[in-house]
Amino acid sequence: MHSAILATFFLLSWTPCWSLPLPYGDDDDDDLSEEDLVFAEHYLKSYYHPATLAGILKKSTVTSTVDRLREMQSFFGLEVTGKLDDPTLDIMRKPRCGVPDVGEYNVFPRTLKWSQTNLTYRIVNYTPDMSHSEVEKAFRKAFKVWSDVTPLNFTRIYDGTADIMISFGTKEHGDFYPFDGPSGLLAHAFPPGPNYGGDAHFDDDETWTSSSKGYNLFIVAAHELGHSLGLDHSKDPGALMFPIYTYTGKSHFMLPDDDVQGIQFLYGPGDEDPNPKHPKTPEKCDPALSLDAITSLRGETMIFKDRFFWRLHPQQVEAELFLTKSFWPELPNHVDAAYEHPSRDLMFIFRGRKFWALNGYDILEGYPRKISDLGFPKEVKRLSAAVHFENTGKTLFFSENHVWSYDDVNQTMDKDYPRLIEEEFPGIGNKVDAVYEKNGYIYFFNGPIQFEYSIWSNRIVRVMPTNSILWC
């Protein structure tokens, strides 16, 4: 087995010249360096159809670099251009798992799984970043994620060879798949089988923690153990088995539905699931789609729903879906309201009685603050929507069946507010889920319906499905 792995490693290390040079993206991407191009080509060869003995001997399976790039863009829900552009490089630079991407909640070739339901694991060594008890707790929780939804049982042993051997290492660490230093590749695991099969390795050049600082060991371990049990990567950005690392927050972790479906395909359900409702990723063309918040941001449109947001570029039809915490780890998972203040290059995010001011990826110092700082009485517990008008300096806030008007210049609430929504904007109903303004029209979202409202004529001019904002 070890000699076979060694032979495979040498084949992977030898890269024949079958690939095509990477084309650049738009004119705005002309500043891509030679280092960017080398990095991108290495990324694509590592995670999209890595060279294997079968692939080398059978030339019909050879995949060009451009084909790999298109597959990578499709996998991550990017616009499939076949060109190396900034959004594609942004994804490539994110910390991730070292296992190649194949798609959905499929399994490794030959549908590898454990034949038994009672499995053992051993923690071979420890990271110096955390206490032994913290490391043990992280792995115990990670195994429980999978045992909660399957008939699998995991028992820790302290010596000898376990089904799943867990270790920390750096660079070359004994399996011929070296780590790359801080960030980048965080960990990898092998599918079920003998020898290395099932083993999980963690890069000790990373800073491992039990919080949002560095990399959360529990989150990475739970992902890698999915591979140890036979799962491949998922295209679903909300899935635990999505290849990119995202800190999911301090709240109780619930295994997403995509992962549940995958692991139960292999092993079946467990006796009693403590979390019978598992979070699902929203589907943009769902006819019943409702939204949580909408805002512009530097020419793009950000559309928030549950733990996610769609990022809609003005020149693209396909919206990109991301976990909110993959961009802003410090924000809550769910957003109540959001708006952009373009002249200040700020985006404001609201959740409950708190709000945040963001400049790009960065939260401004002094935030979060309380919405009472804006002049809301204590009876207002949360906002449902917000929209800013740059030409007047006014911001409208919606809460339950009322609308408030805030003067950004004087930083006070306008007199004669709040007012009833249905009186201020006749015909849109008495609640607003999300709202944004564009070219003299206000777009109000209420459940699966959106209203296009003319500011000049003060009336509804069109009624459309909510999902039409996502080109459905």
UniProtKB/Swiss-Prot annotation:
<dbReference type="Pfam" id="PF00045">
    <property type="entry name" value="Hemopexin"/>
</dbReference>
<dbReference type="InterPro" id="IPR002477">
    <property type="entry name" value="Peptidoglycan-bd-like"/>
</dbReference>
<dbReference type="GO" id="GO:0022617">
    <property type="term" value="P:extracellular matrix disassembly"/>
</dbReference>
<feature type="binding site">
    <location>
        <position position="241"/>
    </location>
    <ligand>
        <name>Zn(2+) 2</name>
    </ligand>
</feature>
<dbReference type="InterPro" id="IPR000585">
    <property type="entry name" value="Hemopexin-like_dom"/>
</dbReference>
<feature type="short sequence motif" description="Cysteine switch">
    <location>
        <begin position="95"/>
        <end position="102"/>
    </location>
</feature>
<feature type="binding site">
    <location>
        <position position="173"/>
    </location>
    <ligand>
        <name>Zn(2+) 1</name>
    </ligand>
</feature>
<feature type="binding site">
    <location>
        <position position="292"/>
    </location>
    <ligand>
        <name>Ca(2+) 4</name>
    </ligand>
</feature>
<feature type="repeat" description="Hemopexin 1">
    <location>
        <begin position="282"/>
        <end position="331"/>
    </location>
</feature>
<dbReference type="GO" id="GO:0004222">
    <property type="term" value="F:metalloendopeptidase activity"/>
</dbReference>
<dbReference type="InterPro" id="IPR033739">
    <property type="entry name" value="M10A_MMP"/>
</dbReference>
<dbReference type="GO" id="GO:0008233">
    <property type="term" value="F:peptidase activity"/>
</dbReference>
<dbReference type="GO" id="GO:0006508">
    <property type="term" value="P:proteolysis"/>
</dbReference>
<feature type="binding site">
    <location>
        <position position="185"/>
    </location>
    <ligand>
        <name>Ca(2+) 3</name>
    </ligand>
</feature>
<feature type="binding site">
    <location>
        <position position="201"/>
    </location>
    <ligand>
        <name>Zn(2+) 1</name>
    </ligand>
</feature>
<keyword id="KW-1015">Disulfide bond</keyword>
<feature type="binding site">
    <location>
        <position position="203"/>
    </location>
    <ligand>
        <name>Ca(2+) 3</name>
    </ligand>
</feature>
<feature type="binding site">
    <location>
        <position position="338"/>
    </location>
    <ligand>
        <name>Ca(2+) 5</name>
    </ligand>
</feature>
<keyword id="KW-0177">Collagen degradation</keyword>
<dbReference type="InterPro" id="IPR001818">
    <property type="entry name" value="Pept_M10_metallopeptidase"/>
</dbReference>
<feature type="repeat" description="Hemopexin 4">
    <location>
        <begin position="429"/>
        <end position="472"/>
    </location>
</feature>
<feature type="binding site">
    <location>
        <position position="294"/>
    </location>
    <ligand>
        <name>Ca(2+) 5</name>
    </ligand>
</feature>
<keyword id="KW-0378">Hydrolase</keyword>
<feature type="binding site">
    <location>
        <position position="197"/>
    </location>
    <ligand>
        <name>Ca(2+) 2</name>
    </ligand>
</feature>
<dbReference type="InterPro" id="IPR024079">
    <property type="entry name" value="MetalloPept_cat_dom_sf"/>
</dbReference>
<feature type="binding site">
    <location>
        <position position="183"/>
    </location>
    <ligand>
        <name>Ca(2+) 3</name>
    </ligand>
</feature>
<feature type="binding site">
    <location>
        <position position="206"/>
    </location>
    <ligand>
        <name>Ca(2+) 3</name>
    </ligand>
</feature>
<keyword id="KW-0645">Protease</keyword>
<feature type="region of interest" description="Interaction with TIMP2">
    <location>
        <begin position="177"/>
        <end position="247"/>
    </location>
</feature>
<feature type="repeat" description="Hemopexin 2">
    <location>
        <begin position="332"/>
        <end position="378"/>
    </location>
</feature>
<feature type="disulfide bond">
    <location>
        <begin position="285"/>
        <end position="472"/>
    </location>
</feature>
<dbReference type="InterPro" id="IPR036365">
    <property type="entry name" value="PGBD-like_sf"/>
</dbReference>
<feature type="binding site">
    <location>
        <position position="199"/>
    </location>
    <ligand>
        <name>Ca(2+) 2</name>
    </ligand>
</feature>
<comment type="function">
    <text>Plays a role in the degradation of extracellular matrix proteins including fibrillar collagen, fibronectin, TNC and ACAN. Cleaves triple helical collagens, including type I, type II and type III collagen, but has the highest activity with soluble type II collagen. Can also degrade collagen type IV, type XIV and type X. May also function by activating or degrading key regulatory proteins, such as TGFB1 and CCN2. Plays a role in wound healing, tissue remodeling, cartilage degradation, bone development, bone mineralization and ossification.</text>
</comment>
<comment type="similarity">
    <text>Belongs to the peptidase M10A family.</text>
</comment>
<feature type="binding site">
    <location>
        <position position="227"/>
    </location>
    <ligand>
        <name>Zn(2+) 2</name>
    </ligand>
</feature>
<dbReference type="GO" id="GO:0001958">
    <property type="term" value="P:endochondral ossification"/>
</dbReference>
<dbReference type="GO" id="GO:0031012">
    <property type="term" value="C:extracellular matrix"/>
</dbReference>
<feature type="binding site">
    <location>
        <position position="181"/>
    </location>
    <ligand>
        <name>Ca(2+) 3</name>
    </ligand>
</feature>
<dbReference type="GO" id="GO:0008270">
    <property type="term" value="F:zinc ion binding"/>
</dbReference>
<feature type="binding site">
    <location>
        <position position="336"/>
    </location>
    <ligand>
        <name>Ca(2+) 4</name>
    </ligand>
</feature>
<keyword id="KW-0482">Metalloprotease</keyword>
